[in-house]
């Protein structure tokens, strides 16, 4: 099975699970990046190549079709938030210690934590 086929299959499996939830407000949690604003900014000496493997657009129709309030994703090891079309996209990654801005684990964890209401 190709990477593209696996990605599409994952989106279809998520959609099937969402169908069982019904019309309730939802939080979609994925490891992969599901919004292009969350890939690593280029040019980047390493990620110019790897961005192709970090995320997918196969979830786009899910955000357009279902009551997704929050989308929490990871994989890129940086922290970012974005609100678009009433969906709050969150990337609260802790990352590797070498990627932290400080040497204080408590400070880094507290910076990565996010509160939200659904």
Describe the function of each predicted region:
Residues 13, 75-76:
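Generic detector of contiguous secondary-structure segments
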Residues 30, 73-74:
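Short His-Asn-centered micro-motif
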């Amino acid at each position: 099975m190709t990477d593209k086929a696996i990605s599409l299959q994952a989106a279809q499996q998520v959609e099937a699970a969402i169908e069982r939830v019904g019309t309730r407000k939802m939080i979609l949690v994925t490891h992969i990046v599901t919004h292009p604003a969350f890939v690593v900014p280029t040019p980047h000496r390493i990620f110019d190549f790897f961005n192709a493997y970090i995320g997918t657009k196969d979830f786009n129709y899910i955000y357009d079709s279902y009551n997704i309030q929050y989308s929490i994703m990871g994989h890129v090891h940086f922290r970012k938030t974005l609100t678009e079309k009433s969906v709050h996209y969150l990337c609260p990654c802790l990352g590797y210690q070498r990627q932290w801005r400080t040497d204080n684990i408590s400070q880094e964890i507290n910076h990565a934590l996010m509160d939200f209401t659904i």
